[in-house]
Amino acid sequence: MGFEELLEQVGGFGPFQLRNLALLALPRILLPLHFLLPVFLAAVPAHRCALPGTPANLSFQDAWLEAYLPREADGTFSSCLRFTHPQAVPNITLGREGRSPGDLQGNRSSMPCTQGWEYDRSEFSSTIATEWDLVCEQKDLSRAASTFFFVGVLVGAVAFGYLSDRFGRRRLLLVAYVSALVLGLASAASVSYVMFAITRTLTGSALAGFTIIVMPLELEWLDVEHRIVAGVLSSTFWTGGVMLLALVGYLIRDWRWLLLAVTLPLAPGILSLWWVPESARWLLTQGRVEEAQRYLLRCARLNGRPVPQDGLSREALSEVAAGERVVRRPSYLDLFRTPRLRHISLCCMVVWFGVNFSYYGQSLAVSGLGLNVYQTQLLFGAVELPSKLLVYLSVRHAGRRLTQAGTLMGAALALGIRLLVASERSSWSTALAVMGKGFSEAAFTTAYLFTSELYPTVLRQTGMGLTALVGRLGGSLAPLAALLDGVWLSLPKLAYGGIALLAACTALLLPETRRAQLPETIQDVERKSLQEEEMAMKQVQT
């Protein structure tokens, strides 16, 4: 008897599993609050050099700025330079001594802002950019905050993946909760950018535990029939978090209090672990039969399933545990040992890199669309709901491969057409940005389903772990690609769209899995490949 048969006895989907999904909803909601937090946390408001003796009389301020600040090519005042000497502005009298800028002498040479900056605080009262003047020569540091965070997620994913297999999902989930809470509070109390960068990187590592542990902890208590439904249901919690971030960001305009607001809910999450069950499958692989028996009996009781006395006896569970332990632990090298599996793994790595790169690249670019940042964030969250409906319908009728390629192609086209729109603030540009975000979310949802069906059962978790790892690398590089706007304003969009297009073409190289039986072993994957080649040869001959 295997573990799937045990689940049939105690109920593979019922009140026990629904309660588990509800208890694990909190980390899914909190993840986007942290992953997309740089939209508000690291925002750079309009700014200009702080000037000496700026007049209080508003009617004279424009003339005063004209005397001190050079203009950019688009006619706006420079954000990073001021004139070395005030320039002449005719027929205007300013200053405490009654001088007019027309009386002031000096050439038109400029210099950096030596007295700091003044910021437009109408949208944000405080961000890390205004806190530590991360503008002009230091602007890259503001954008790099996202990269530091995602690098932490990348490292944490590797660590939590290994440790949760060794010490258990529930115990490591507690570690993730506590460490994320402590490090999040430390980030909010940062006294320097260096301290903030370090604590945010470590916070990313801690939160990676949620991404690695929560999904297996849900799926390992579900029967095969309900795993896809549960996966789609769980993904809506992420969408809820995306929209919730818009509300929280709107209500809290100071970055320290905002960081506290998204960190403190981790505390009740720690308490909720009292009711979260450990994975009985993992317990059996470790030979901890008594604990597994206790959780399985609890599952049967909550699901209202009468269990035969010998069905969950220690002897029966010991036999299952022995069967689970004799299976050789898979390694990442197994994903590349055979031709077909190597092909699938390499293609999935490209697809996941493209999906993450385009998703986070667009999700973090919420300024300059003709709406304020809060409206844009809400729109970006709301469009994810119809995106999930699109995926649900498309994978059933068009198939997984075409859906994956089509959604990535849609994201690439939306980004490409935006390059042709004259104004970023036009309604067309805004609509295309929302469409691109919707397609990238649809590609993300499809990738989870498609990838899980491509890998055989013995390597499914290993394959998902590898592709997720490469995907997080794409998420780490996405904020850095935004720095390319210093070379050409549209270059970041070209990068996001180009990578999405490459991933779309790569997805077409993957085999279709619609209505196909899931492979159990590596041999099943290779055997299917040979069958497809034989069918292709017959079609060519006929």
UniProtKB/Swiss-Prot annotation:
InterPro entries linked to this entry: MFS_dom, MFS_sugar_transport-like, MFS_trans_sf, Orgcat_transp/SVOP
Keywords noted in UniProt: Cell membrane, Ion transport, Membrane, Transmembrane, Transmembrane helix, Transport
UniProt-recorded Gene Ontology molecular function terms: alpha-ketoglutarate transmembrane transporter activity; organic anion transmembrane transporter activity; prostaglandin transmembrane transporter activity; sodium-independent organic anion transmembrane transporter activity; transmembrane transporter activity
Protein name: Solute carrier family 22 member 7
Record field: catalytic activity: orotate(out) + L-glutamate(in) = orotate(in) + L-glutamate(out); 3',5'-cyclic GMP(in) = 3',5'-cyclic GMP(out); GMP(in) = GMP(out); 2'-deoxyguanosine(in) = 2'-deoxyguanosine(out)
Family, per entry: Belongs to the major facilitator (TC 2.A.1) superfamily. Organic cation transporter (TC 2.A.1.19) family.
Record keyword Transmembrane helix present: yes
